[in-house]
């Protein structure tokens, strides 16, 4: 294994120290470790907080700033942050209007964020939750009960962050997050595995002519391993799966801060249909050249046009990675005029930055 690290035990500490030094708009906290906006708490606005295992950079710490997250809790590589990190971060960013926890659907994340939610409620913080489960590839996986939360998380953090920035209430922000989760669809493929520093070897092996179809962002198995032929064929198979697997029913939990208890809600993922308008994210899983990602986007635009989908906005690049995995994911999020206005609203973070 050759990686630009000193000691595997210091990877998280050193990368966070570098992030904070590179971006004075962020504050790195210690004991426990978490990151916030330097101006947190922001009075009069809902605070957004997310987190998860490291290795997916720039998610989540790269999305802290005006118009997006108030703070983020990074765990060790592919390891959920502990409840005390989440609790302390939320206490730091709470500006009095409540805290919304955006949680990717992985067993460890769910358990730890739910524990922190109850601790926050007991401490008098108005808090609620949104669970993201946009991966259409598999229902259950190595890390999840239910579908995985992947790159649509980035889009939701941007859009809900814009709503919080303009002064929307905690309930409105949470409702928007759940709506966007039901309108977003993602799928990924891998041509090569990632290497976790502590393991020192690739997490799986593929033959030269194989790809992992429906891979997760921790290298979890997907739908199957199948022959890799060409860019167009790969995008076509992914696009068809997004459409075919795009509708499903499931039960998701959220915290009702008024009743002080968990509530279960039946939700339906909305399939993409002709006439829909979308934001398209072509996401580098770590080691895929940008030139290839633009090739992917070229084919994706053709398939969207054929299916009657209009791409209103796009992101192409590394936004939700899996260390050094060779591969990419596609996310399509159904939008309307209001959603696009939130997308176009100013955002100033290390990884997304536009507007005044």
Swiss-Prot record:
Residues annotated to bind dihydroxyacetone: 53-56, 104, 109
Record has Nucleus as a keyword: no
Matching Gene3D superfamilies: Dihydroxyacetone kinase, domain 1 (3.40.50.10440), Dihydroxyacetone kinase, domain 2 (3.30.1180.20)
EC number annotated for this UniProt entry: 2.7.1.121
Catalytic activity, reaction form: dihydroxyacetone + phosphoenolpyruvate = dihydroxyacetone phosphate + pyruvate
UniProt activity-regulation remark: Inhibited by chloro-3-hydroxyacetone and D,L-glyceraldehyde.
Taxonomic source organism: Escherichia coli (strain K12)
Function as written in the Swiss-Prot or TrEMBL entry: Dihydroxyacetone binding subunit of the dihydroxyacetone kinase, which is responsible for the phosphoenolpyruvate (PEP)-dependent phosphorylation of dihydroxyacetone via a phosphoryl group transfer from DhaL-ATP. Binds covalently dihydroxyacetone in hemiaminal linkage. DhaK also acts as corepressor of the transcription activator DhaR by binding to the sensor domain of DhaR. In the presence of dihydroxyacetone, DhaL-ADP displaces DhaK and stimulates DhaR activity. In the absence of dihydroxyacetone, DhaL-ADP is converted by the PTS to DhaL-ATP, which does not bind to DhaR.
Record's protein name: PEP-dependent dihydroxyacetone kinase, dihydroxyacetone-binding subunit DhaK
UniProt-recorded Gene Ontology molecular function terms: glycerone kinase activity; identical protein binding; phosphoenolpyruvate-glycerone phosphotransferase activity; protein homodimerization activity
A biological process term (GO) from this entry: monosaccharide catabolic process
Keyword terms of this UniProt record: Glycerol metabolism, Kinase, Transferase
InterPro entries cross-referenced by the UniProt entry: DhaK_1, DhaK_dom, Dihydroxyacetone_Kinase
Active site: residue positions: 56, 218
Record-level GO cellular component terms: cytosol; transferase complex
Induction pattern: Activated by DhaR.
Note in the entry: Unlike the carbohydrate-specific transporters of the PTS, the complex DhaKML has no transport activity.
Pathway(s) of this molecule: Polyol metabolism; glycerol degradation
Assembly and binders: Homodimer. The dihydroxyacetone kinase complex is composed of a homodimer of DhaM, a homodimer of DhaK and the subunit DhaL. DhaL also forms a complex with DhaR.
